[in-house]
Amino acid sequence: MHEEEIYTSLQWDSPAPDTYQKCLSSNKCSGACCLVMVISCVFCMGLLTASIFLGVKLLQVSTIAMQQQEKLIQQERALLNFTEWKRSCALQMKYCQAFMQNSLSSAHNSSPCPNNWIQNRESCYYVSEIWSIWHTSQENCLKEGSTLLQIESKEEMDFITGSLRKIKGSYDYWVGLSQDGHSGRWLWQDGSSPSPGLLPAERSQSANQVCGYVKSNSLLSSNCSTWKYFICEKYALRSSV
């Protein structure tokens, strides 16, 4: 009887099976949570490292792209300068050919200037009776062994404008002055620059290339593709006496 009471007492003091299972279950959950947290941290660190790596690579690619773009811009500028230089050389070549043709034809001609040309000192001028764009006007003058008018001084400008008033009045006449839209320089056909007092008074802002023309007493500028009269010029034949 006494032993049964002791056994009952011991059995009552021992923990219940449910409580022990709960503790085991609680310990298992805590370990799983820690494992998940560790894996999450490792994954986040991996993402952060990958993001930094990709960011560095993107920066490198952007830098290379900017360098390539700068090189491309420089190459385009070099090509543009070469094209302008080639065009200038072609114009000077045509100018030299026209000068030689004029010299040869003058050797067989007794008068200082051809018919329908106006003489002023050492130059002969032809005032066209047709309209054309600037480049076509240039070609028409070359066919006559001359070039578009190149005004060297204010005295020559006064003679031209005075003669035009007597011939046709106030019209527009192309001269051999042009300005490229990229370089912005005014140049005569022989590659020389006009004197500051003979620069055009106004410029068309909408055109890629503008050319000079004479109207009344002024030297102005306009789109080279517009239609105007033109003035040719060549050297007068010197007397062989």
Swiss-Prot record:
The keyword Secreted does not apply. It comes from the Eukaryota. One of its GO terms (cellular component) is cell surface. One of its GO terms (biological process) is positive regulation of cytokine production. One of its GO terms (molecular function) is carbohydrate binding. SUPFAM superfamilies: C-type lectin-like. It is a single-pass type II membrane protein. N-glycosylated. The chain crosses the membrane at residues 36-56. In peripheral blood highly restricted on the surface of BDCA31(+) dendritic cells and on a small subset of CD14(+) and CD16(-) monocytes. Residues 1-35 are cytoplasmic. A motif (ITAM-like) lies at residues 5-10. Homodimer. This is C-type lectin domain family 9 member A. It comes from Homo sapiens.
